[in-house]
């Protein structure tokens, strides 16, 4: 999966990590969208075993951004992080009465993309909420398109009761 971003970014991958992708995703969801320093702090205290390899990959992506691209580590954000399924090693566990149960040792490929986004004080003074509100006000004040044909009033559909009474009155020969 290739991700294109408007901000400068760096990537790191850990392949064939001996942790289930489902358990890795549980940890990954804690750090998505956070700053690298916050993410590493969260993972340092997370009790899950998958937090260690995820923290290693995030640290590697931050080091790649700093050394390869010359980005400031203080502005790095965990933009994209995901765990794909790797190959599964299959083992046999002997059980009673000649049976054998299969053990699946799952692996995962963990990918992290960090972006260098400007800090909040370097951004414009308006909040994103204020920018959205301005955009909606501008859309509301824009002149609406005029339709070429004026709409004709919709005809009222006859109900079953009305149609039955009209049929009966026609059969009687009277007009109601």
From Swiss-Prot:
Listed Gene3D superfamilies: Ribosomal protein L22/L17
Domain of life assignment: Bacteria
Keywords attached to this entry: Ribonucleoprotein, Ribosomal protein, RNA-binding, rRNA-binding
Family annotation (Pfam families): Ribosomal_L22
GO molecular function: rRNA binding; structural constituent of ribosome
Basic and acidic residues bias locations: 159-176
Entry similarity comment: Belongs to the universal ribosomal protein uL22 family.
Function summary: This protein binds specifically to 23S rRNA; its binding is stimulated by other ribosomal proteins, e.g. L4, L17, and L20. It is important during the early stages of 50S assembly. It makes multiple contacts with different domains of the 23S rRNA in the assembled 50S subunit and ribosome.
Subunit (UniProt): Part of the 50S ribosomal subunit.
Protein name listed in UniProt: Large ribosomal subunit protein uL22
Protein source organism: Mycobacterium ulcerans (strain Agy99)
Origin organism lineage: Bacteria, Bacillati, Actinomycetota, Actinomycetes, Mycobacteriales
């Amino acid at each position: 999966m290739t991700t294109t971003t408007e901000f400068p970014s760096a990537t790191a991958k850990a392949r064939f990590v001996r942790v289930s992708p489902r358990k890795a995703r549980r940890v990954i969801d804690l750090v998505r969208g956070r700053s690298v320093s916050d993410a590493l702090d969260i993972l340092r205290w997370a009790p899950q075993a998958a937090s260690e390899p995820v923290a290693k990959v995030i640290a590697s992506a931050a080091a790649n951004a700093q050394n390869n691209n010359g980005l400031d580590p203080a502005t790095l954000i965990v933009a994209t992080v995901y765990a794909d399924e790797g190959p599964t090693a299959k083992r046999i566990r002997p059980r009673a009465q000649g049976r054998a149960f299969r053990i699946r040792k799952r692996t995962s490929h963990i990918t992290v993309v960090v972006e260098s986004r400007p800090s909040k004080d370097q951004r414009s003074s308006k909040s994103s909420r204020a920018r959205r509100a301005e955009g909606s006000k501008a859309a509301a004040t824009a002149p609406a398109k005029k339709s070429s044909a004026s709409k004709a009033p919709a005809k009222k559909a006859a109900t079953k009761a009305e149609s039955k009474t009209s049929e009966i009155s026609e059969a009687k020969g009277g007009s109601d």
